[in-house]
Amino acid sequence: MAKRYLLDFEKPLVELEKQIEQIKELARDSEVDVSQQLLQLETLAARRREEIFKSLTPAQKIQVARHPQRPSTLDFVQMFCDDWIELHGDRNGGDDMALVGGIGSINNRPVLILGHQKGRDTKENVVRNFGMAKPGGYRKALRLMQHADRFSLPILTFIDTPGAYAGLTAEEQGQGEAIARNLREMFGLKVPIVATVIGEGGSGGALGIGVADRLLMFEHSVYTVASPEACASILWRDAAKAPEAASALKITGKDLLKLGIIDEVLPEPSGGNNWAPLDAGNTLKEAIEKHLNALLQMTKDELIEERYKKFRVLGKFIEANNIEEIYSEIPQKTE
C-alpha cells in the first residue's frame, strides 16, 4: 500500500502513523503477535482523526479536496462501473486527457460517464494538465453527451478541477465558447443528468459539465466561482488571505445546500475519501442509483422544465442586512 500523505492539520497523527507502520513491519518480519498493540494504536488514530475532521475550516476542506490520494473519476469508474469503454476525441483533432468519458453500466443500467481527471504524481499531472480541461475536452464532453441523448443513456458527471485551462492556446481555441455551448446544450438534453463534485469544483471549468438535474457533493469537496487564492489576489491583492476568502465564498457542501445550489451532501469516511476509497465508492454508487431512479420516473419534457427552473432561480438578488436573512429567503433542503 502506498504511504499515506498527511496534510498540515493532520500533524497530530504523524507519530501514531509511524508507530503503526513500525508495528506492521515487525509483524511481517517476525512471528511476534502484535495484533493487540496494533488495534489499540489504530483505534486511537481513528479517534483523533475523527476529532480533527469534524471541525475543518473551509480552507482545510480545500486541502482535503486537493489531496493527491483522493479517489478520481477513473478510480470511481473502476469501483462500480461494469463494461467500461472509454471514448476519445472531439472529432476536431484533439483528445484532452484532463476530461475523460465513456460508456459503462451500473447494476446493468447503461450510462455515460464524464469527469475531470487529475494525476497522482507530477508526471501524470502533466499528462492530465492537473485536471484543467482545454476547449477540446469540453467539445469531447458535448459530443459524448449528444451521443447519450440520442441513445437515451443517463449522464453522470464527476467534477474535480481547479478550473478550465486559461492558457493562451486555450483562449485562441475558444475556451469561453466551448464552455458556453455546453451550458446551452445541456439544458436541452432529454436524459437524466446527475453531477457530483468529487473533489474541487472550480469556476467555469466545473460548470462545463455541471448543468444537471441533481448536483451532489462529497462532504469535504468544494464548489466555488473562483479559487480562494485567485479571489484573495483580486480583492485584497494578497494571496495569503486565501483562508479568509475561502470562508467568504461559501464553498462547502453545508453552505451550498443551505443556499439551494446543491441537492445533497454525501458523507465521507473519517479522514476523507482518501482513507477509505471503497467506502466512498459505495456511498457515491448508492446516491447515484437513488437519484437516477427518481429522475427516470419523469418524462423528457418534465426533465427539461425542472432543470431550467433549478438554474433559473440561482443568482436571485436579495437585499438583506446579513447572510442569515438571505438564507431565510431560500427554500431549505435537508441533508
UniProtKB/Swiss-Prot annotation:
UniProt keyword list: ATP-binding, Cytoplasm, Fatty acid biosynthesis, Fatty acid metabolism, Lipid biosynthesis, Lipid metabolism, Nucleotide-binding, Transferase
Gene3D superfamilies, per the entry: 2-enoyl-CoA Hydratase, Chain A, domain 1
GO molecular-function terms, A-Z: acetyl-CoA carboxylase activity; ATP binding; carboxyl- or carbamoyltransferase activity
Ranges for domain CoA carboxyltransferase C-terminal: 40-294
Listed GO biological process terms: fatty acid biosynthetic process; malonyl-CoA biosynthetic process
Subcellular location field: Cytoplasm
Principal location: cytoplasm
Pathway info: Lipid metabolism; malonyl-CoA biosynthesis; malonyl-CoA from acetyl-CoA: step 1/1
Catalysis: reaction(s): N(6)-carboxybiotinyl-L-lysyl-[protein] + acetyl-CoA = N(6)-biotinyl-L-lysyl-[protein] + malonyl-CoA
GO cellular component: acetyl-CoA carboxylase complex
EC number: 2.1.3.15
Cysteines joined through disulfide linkages: none
Biological role: Component of the acetyl coenzyme A carboxylase (ACC) complex. First, biotin carboxylase catalyzes the carboxylation of biotin on its carrier protein (BCCP) and then the CO(2) group is transferred by the carboxyltransferase to acetyl-CoA to form malonyl-CoA.
PANTHER family: ACETYL-COENZYME A CARBOXYLASE CARBOXYL TRANSFERASE SUBUNIT ALPHA, ACETYL-COENZYME A CARBOXYLASE CARBOXYL TRANSFERASE SUBUNIT ALPHA, CHLOROPLASTIC
Subunit architecture: Acetyl-CoA carboxylase is a heterohexamer composed of biotin carboxyl carrier protein (AccB), biotin carboxylase (AccC) and two subunits each of ACCase subunit alpha (AccA) and ACCase subunit beta (AccD).
Membership in a protein family: Belongs to the AccA family.
UniProt-recorded name of the protein: Acetyl-coenzyme A carboxylase carboxyl transferase subunit alpha
Upper classification of the organism: Bacteria, Bacillati, Cyanobacteriota, Cyanophyceae, Synechococcales
